[in-house]
Amino acid sequence: MRTAALSLALAALCLPLAAAEGGKPGPFTHVLKAGEIAEDCVTLKSGQSREYAWTADTSVKFNLHWHEGETVHYPVRLDGQWKGRGRFTADRDQSYCWMWSAPKAMGATVTGTFKPIESP
């Protein structure tokens, strides 16, 4: 019984991570309510690259980040952006997240695309 309860608790902890595993190649749309965030995460190996481009119908906060224990690293961190574009190359095997935050006073719609880049 105790093992079953522990297994259930561990499975519940994994659900938010599974739901956040986006970042698949192709187009995406996030409709955010006021103050909400959207996050697309993908695991990249060292040297793998991904191109991204997005636009929003209002200015949003945008960042690209990864976690190392309790520390969050931000290779890209921008406030008040209506659009963004770039190419990110992983420097380590890691799960990386692209995140958008709507303003607290209003919602936002973010549309864009992800494109994996094949290594030469």
Task: Please describe what each predicted stretch is.
Residues 7-16:
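Bacterial N-terminal signal peptides
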